[in-house]
A protein has these predicted regions:
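Bacterial Sec-dependent N-terminal signal peptides
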Residues: 1-22
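Short carbohydrate-recognition loop motifs
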Residues: 32-49
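Secretory/extracellular carbohydrate-interaction modules
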Residues: 48-144
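Beta-strand-rich interaction surfaces with strong enrichment in secreted/lumenal proteins
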Residues: 49-56, 157-162, 205
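Carbohydrate-binding surfaces in secreted/extracellular proteins
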Residues: 65, 162-193
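Short, aromatic/His-centered strand-loop micro-motif at the edge of beta-sheets
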Residues: 144-170
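Flexible glycan-contacting loops in extracellular carbohydrate-active proteins
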Residues: 193-216
Length: 226
């Protein structure tokens, strides 16, 4: 049977307040600022921040955006933590529940993210000394017990795979129905993980802490076949 491919696009160009409202801020500090500057979100986070796209994602899909860590002498201009969660949810009674629900504890603290099941990539974490990929398993014991924290599945520590100041990175994340998820940055494949228990439905969040970052060109591409 002939296969036809249909591409459905959800585009976020940050052109209006309505578009900005598609993002939900989960911040540890009340001093956090997410401002709209032209076609770009300008994010100042004195402490932990998860910026959630409110619409859930379903595999197969591709996530694309451009991001920059600003180092221009400001109080939060620290070169670190261009991170993200994808296909994130809170499992409740066998169902994938939105991390944005009021019933879900969301403080902006990084340790509270262990309540999620998701994929996580920390690019230039730990003061720009590591780039790491993990799969979170919603083990809430990990919040207080390091022994329960998810293992590192992929790690880079060389300078070629750490952050450069004021550089605009192109990020592409692919989620396939067969359990494969891929993370590319500037067209370089950093992660190709085959998950034996695939996460095919969930939410995306841009994650950072104590930094000044910019985000633009948000796009989700769905491919469906028949």
């Amino acid at each position: 049977m002939k296969r036809h491919h249909f591409y459905f696009f959800i585009l976020f160009f940050v052109l209006s307040v309505n578009c900005k409202a598609q993002w939900r801020i989960e911040a540890e500090s009340e001093a956090t600022r997410v401002l709209l500057r032209g076609d770009t979100l300008d994010i100042t986070a004195p402490k932990g921040l998860s910026l959630w796209w409110e619409t859930p994602l379903t595999a197969p899909c591709t996530i694309e955006y451009r991001a920059c860590v600003v180092v221009e002498g400001g109080p939060c201009d620290r070169l670190s933590d261009l991170n993200c969660f994808w296909m994130a949810s809170v499992p409740v009674a066998g169902k994938a529940v939105s991390p944005l629900l009021n019933s879900v504890k969301a403080t902006g603290r990084f340790v509270d993210s262990y309540r999620l099941q998701c994929y996580y990539l920390g690019f230039g974490g730990n003061y720009n000394t590591t780039t790491r990929f993990r799969r979170y398993n919603a083990d809430t014991l990990a919040i207080t017990d390091e022994a329960h924290r998810p293992p590192i599945l992929k790690e880079y520590t060389d300078s070629a795979h750490l952050l450069k100041p004021n550089h605009w990175y192109s990020v592409r994340i692919e989620v396939h129905t067969d359990g494969l998820t891929c993370y590319y940055i500037d067209d370089e494949l950093l992660v190709d993980y085959h998950d034996p228990s695939p996460l095919t439905y969930g939410w995306f969040a841009f994650r950072t802490t104590w930094s000044h970052t910019r985000l633009t060109g948000w796009k989700v591409i769905y491919e469906k076949s028949e």
